[in-house]
């Protein structure tokens, strides 16, 4: 996804000219949901009788329950398992269900404990024991099934979701994989009332995964028993933000604004890369790139030498014998895994090829941001007209 800075400044010595290219989409602002980053919670499905279910994000350790429609679980785009969820897929074919090729990145919420986001599975209700003839089971227990019925995704990749368990003896039991589509086999069964699985995501972005719980309230008393009186919950979506850009968007927008309500729906207008939810003329991707807010109209240009937010500053430096065009801009530091590339460029005309800037000077601002200064070295004589811009690419 490429997006060019929407203000291009040109300088001719003795006069200044601006060319401003702005496309504004006026969209009402929204309020963000709750972000979960370092906490043990559960996807909780509570059968309350009379065909009624309560579905919440259960807070363990005394934490309050949360509404899944107002909550986003965040997976950091940092190395697994100590810092985040980004791992490398093994080359063996048994891992094809992850939806990425061998030795490529995949993002994981682990089955085993992590101090980062650690969502488990919880069922509550008087469910009956029955024999489950699923090839992955083949025994009797009071199973509850959690099926995936659709997955929405907003990002640059394919957006595949998977779930599997690590079994005794090194066995990997795959429950759900959307890499080959969604079928009636994409169900996770558990019987303990509480459990954990591995969850996999093929790409950074925002995922909306819609689950449905099922269970039997009775059985026929046979040997083995057959379940009777099947009950099924309503379909409930849970939201996951994978990576820094997705987390940033979730800070400002409600979960339903981050991704379509079904796998076939487009990304909501407010959170498209080119969206302008606050009506200030700055596309969403550039708000992310230059430390601006998509929730308030805060159009500004960076203050040279001291600014901490704003679009790139393009100015004429006349402190030397040969004046030079200077671009100064904010850049997200690589340590924060922003998946952004910044390309400062110069040109003599808006119609010609833009040339990349040369050497840069970098000044740290804080743990997230740094200030970058580049100088145009291509000016040949005093009547030269030069333009500067910063092009931004999300990877």
Regions found by a protein language model. Name each.
Residues 1-14:
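N-terminal secretory signal peptides that target proteins for export/translocation
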Residues 33-193, 228, 241-243:
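Phosphate/adenylate-binding glycine loop and adjacent helical scaffold
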Residues 195, 203-207:
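Short tyrosine-centred short linear motifs in exposed loops/low-complexity segments
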Residues 207-215:
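A short beta-strand micro-motif common to beta-rich folds, especially ectodomain repeats
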